[in-house]
Amino acid sequence: MQCNDVQATEPDIKVSLTRVGVTNLKKLVKLKRTNKRDIVLLPTFEVFVDLPSSQKGIHMSRSPEVIEEVVENILLEKEIYGVEDLSVEIVMKLFEKHEYATRAEVMLYSDYMMEETSPVTQKDSQEIAKIMARAYGVKDDCGKIHVKKMVGAEVVGITACPCAQNMLKENAVTSLKEKGFSSEDIEKILDSVTIATHNQRGIGTVMIEVPSGYTVGISKIIKIIKDSMSGEVYELLKRSDEAYVVEMAHKNPKFVEDCAREMIKRVVDVFDYLPEDTQVLVRQVNKESIHRHDAFAERNSTIRELRDELKTLTN
């Protein structure tokens, strides 16, 4: 029995839709590495196309079908080295399957396992970062497809609040003065101890556009995020490691804004070879320990704009 193509019929309400597709779709993916073993990921996909006002629905099954075809092709034939390139492959296939679409978008997220060593006892453990990629394609009036791709990571760290630390330092100075300590002794005491403050679990995110002919290493992005907070977090810490991590974080207090700005500076320094119109997204979220709310800072810009601002500040 032949079924009618209900999706191709006209809708009752003729309004176009920006994004229609599927989310929370998981697939096993293998990515190639030069002279190293393959990376195995279990990413979650979000896949969308636009829908014209003249059509009732997209052919929904075609979107997961595209991912299945691309993933199988990678496993059997084609060599893909990055999650951003995987996203581009899917976008191009979406246009083939959804001939009515003028825009297509793919987002993927995956846990990424790394080896980490504790700072004092040198204990090895597995640490998890989240890696992500986005590809966005637009079909012009001539039928030519233009695709932009981005790659990024999300990393958890620790931050120490400078404000509370400064207040506790002032309280300590007042208390020591009342007990008869000289200003010189107070300075020596405070230089010898770690001043307390409250901490946050910081979540840093960096997304960078990958222009055609360029590469952006995810490992470099992960390092930038780690180095931009008060300190790193570790799955395995012995007592001496724990003391070291806490002390170092308190010696490097940072607001959520400080972390975001530090990431911006490091991105500009590390990826100085990228074209000036390269898009960059930086985001920091700090999970507060003494509040129910979270702290948030973000910048969405280009390499040129960020570099120009940094130059202005240093001149």
From Swiss-Prot:
Enzyme Commission number: 3.5.4.39
Q: Does the keyword Secreted apply?
A: no
The UniProt record lists the keyword Metal-binding: yes
Q: What reaction(s) does this enzyme catalyze?
A: GTP + H2O = 7,8-dihydroneopterin 2',3'-cyclic phosphate + formate + diphosphate + H(+)
Q: In which pathway does it act?
A: Cofactor biosynthesis; 5,6,7,8-tetrahydromethanopterin biosynthesis
Annotated positions for site May be catalytically important:
161
**Which InterPro entries does UniProt cross-reference here?**
GTP_cyclohydrolase_FolE2/MptA (IPR003801), GTP_cyclohydrolase_MptA (IPR022840)
Could you say which enzyme class this protein belongs to? hydrolase
Q: Which GO terms describe its biological process?
A: tetrahydromethanopterin biosynthetic process
Entry cofactors: Fe(2+)
- List the keywords (alphabetical): Hydrolase, Iron, Metal-binding
The UniProt similarity line reads:
Belongs to the GTP cyclohydrolase IV family.
- What name has this protein been given in UniProt? GTP cyclohydrolase MptA
Q: Which gene encodes it?
A: mptA
